[in-house]
């Protein structure tokens, strides 16, 4: 109600009104009436949410979306809300989100969130909306963050979100497996050292080539086949022929790029070459990369910048220097770099996410303990697919113990 009552005056004070048109002025002059007032953007829809309010505005002639984006801070103070963000929906229509409190202080994900294959909710945005990791839209991602920045919790949320889906999880954890091996029951392949990681990545490259052979055989290119039925990736194949998609999670990628001897340098070059090939060619074969690390710059050697250029999705938790933030957002948005280095140390899990379009937002993943992630992976262990090319890297685990249920209650002894 406060927003509706003060809407016209606030918009005029913030410079978001346009003067009346000539025909309205002429009509008022002919009717001997007062000159009409300036007009603010028209409200198309007003929708209350659990965190605030969403306005959909129709811009007046001469206005653009940048005018609204440039005044969000003034709108925040004028309406007395915690935060205001805006985004352009289509030409001439802007959505303005107002939040009444800091939704990132205590993250509460909605009870029901929209899920689709390869699209999972992982965090909450500062405007109260759910942040999704959509592998079909953004195939490969890079996650950076210093120690104790919440990077591992974000990775756990990814695994927990993917666990119920029909997807093969492949993990490379060179910290001797302390992060990913507790979740091993939901992983189709795991590697805990650079030597095993090299063999695993080369096996993935071989699997990718086999998938392309399958797509080539099932393309169904002929004069009589409509274009819509021609297969170009695994999602165009029939469901009974479609290979299972693979998500590759790499923790502490710097461990794969460091070397001290000539033999380790050769191994490192082969690892980076395999990662670059998967990043360049893996999308159509249903192979998606999720690279995590503390730094990911050119000091890690040749091929790193080529690999980084293929990682469209960027997420940066708290970093210790501006250079690390530039590694994630230097080619995306200078404002995102500034936001990443301003994340305080007492808010682990807060991150800045962006993509190659230049858009970015602050997010925070809900705190998921390792025990909770293990329980989710154990619950969905039966959904772990068998990938023949990766069978040699399948973790060998003992079966889960079956809980014994007594058939009858034991009666207490009586005197």
Curated annotation (Swiss-Prot):
Keywords: ATP-binding, Nucleotide-binding, Plasmid. The keyword 4Fe-4S does not apply. GO terms for molecular function: ATP binding; DNA binding. Residues 127-326 form the FtsK domain. It comes from the Bacteria. ATP binds at residues 145-152. This is Transfer protein TraSA. The lineage of its organism: Bacteria, Bacillati, Actinomycetota, Actinomycetes, Kitasatosporales. The gene is traSA.
